[in-house]
Amino acid sequence: YAAEYDLDPLLVYSFIRTESGFDPGATSSVDARGLMQMTEETFLWLRSKLGLGEEVSFGDLYDPDVSIRFGCYYLHLCLVRYNGDISTAAAAYHSGWGTVDALLQKEEHSEDGLTLSGFPYNQMHHYVEKITACYGVYTRLYGTP
């Protein structure tokens, strides 16, 4: 699915590592599920955007294929929305578009209104830091596509 959504597979691995530690049965405290840790609200929205019906259920996110398909699609949408900026897209993947859009309107968090330059929430800051650090390690180990 990385190729289908024009994503670097190493970036996808970074999200999977950060989100679930490669555990397909992972469930978070907010009931996000699967390798790429998706909430039901996000899953239902993406299922509709993908033109899929009830043949794919929220519980199917425990299937690695389903989780990676939906996670890659969502990551693709985040990267498109935030002009390819990995840190801003990661913040949106983690905290939602509404949160990131609101932060982009504040000068203390965005110098240009397009990318985040400051992360006001510790959890968001640590999440983005983990994604970028992991991606850096993977690209050093395996190169860039």
Per-region residue spans from a language model:
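Catalytic glycan-binding domains that act on GlcNAc-containing polysaccharides
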Residues: Y1-P145
